[in-house]
From Swiss-Prot:
Chain spans, region Disordered: 88-115
GO molecular function: RNA polymerase II cis-regulatory region sequence-specific DNA binding
Cross-referenced CDD domains: homeodomain
Residue ranges of the annotated DNA-binding region, renumbered to this chain: 30-89
Gene: HD-10
Pfam family, one: Homeodomain
Subcellular localization(s) per the UniProt record: Nucleus
Keyword terms, alphabetized: DNA-binding, Homeobox, Nucleus
GO cellular component, one term: nucleus
GO biological process terms held by the UniProt record: cell differentiation; regulation of transcription by RNA polymerase II
Residue ranges, compositional bias (Polar residues): 92-102
Protein name: Homeobox protein HD-10
Length: 227
């Protein structure tokens, strides 16, 4: 015990001698308060942060000498600024994700354009979003089908396009004859309105093919056989 007490006393005496050097008294209960950076110091630090967010030891030392700060204080300031930028970025990303989730899944599909109809060359495309009255007004003023529509005609299987019997191989399903006219069935979205029949403009095989037997398929080899 005596030996331990002597060593402790000598150590305390040596520390006391070092503490009073330079007319400075060491207070073990002294609390060091954080110093706020001035506007001039903050301006230099922010300008440096824009060009280099992670300054090395030499840069921190130069900044400390220039601003009257310790290199450790400069290092802490840059650490805090990087953490602040990271936090703001994460917050902005979370807000963006919440905004996208509130819009719902329909918002992504609404911007996409509808697929083109396979038979849009045979009949006009009718958007489903349009009012119901649009389906009942046909033919339109700019339509080539100016003929009237027969009443009481049966409604067979729905099909796209029009043509004459035997034209299925060319992509034109046949029309039905009613009196002296021939009519094709207009295609509407399922469940919207009843099927209606319209009279196409008059044409025959010779209008498109010299003979249905001469050219069995579009682009096929000619055949000398006549109808």
């Amino acid at each position: 015990m005596d030996n331990f007490g002597g060593n402790f006393f000598n150590s305390y005496s040596n520390n006391s001698n070092r503490e009073v050097e330079g007319n400075q008294y060491f207070d073990p209960y002294f609390v060091k308060h954080r110093k706020r950076t001035t506007k001039a110091q903050l301006k230099v630090l922010e300008e440096t942060f824009e060009t280099n967010i992670r300054p090395d030891a030499n840069m921190r030392k130069k900044l400390g000498e220039q601003l009257g700060m310790t290199p450790r204080s400069v290092q802490v300031w840059f650490q805090n600024r990087r953490a602040k930028i990271k936090k703001l970025t994460q917050k902005k990303m979370m807000q963006q994700e919440n905004t996208d989730n509130t819009k719902g899944p329909d918002a992504a599909h609404g911007s996409s354009s509808p697929k083109e109809c396979k038979y849009n060359s045979y009949y006009p495309y009718i958007p489903i979003q349009g009012p119901l009255e649009e389906f009942n007004v046909y033919p339109r003023d700019n339509s080539i089908y100016k003929h009237g529509m027969p009443q009481g005609m049966a409604s067979p299987i729905m099909y796209e396009g029009f043509g004459y019997r035997g034209h299925e191989e060319y992509g034109y399903p046949y029309v039905q004859r009613y009196g002296g006219g021939e009519y094709y069935q207009m295609q509407y979205p399922y469940g919207m309105v009843q099927a209606q029949w319209h009279q196409p403009p008059g044409f025959r095989d010779d209008d498109y093919y010299h003979s249905a037997r001469k050219q069995q398929y579009r682009g096929g080899a000619p055949n000398s056989e006549k109808m």
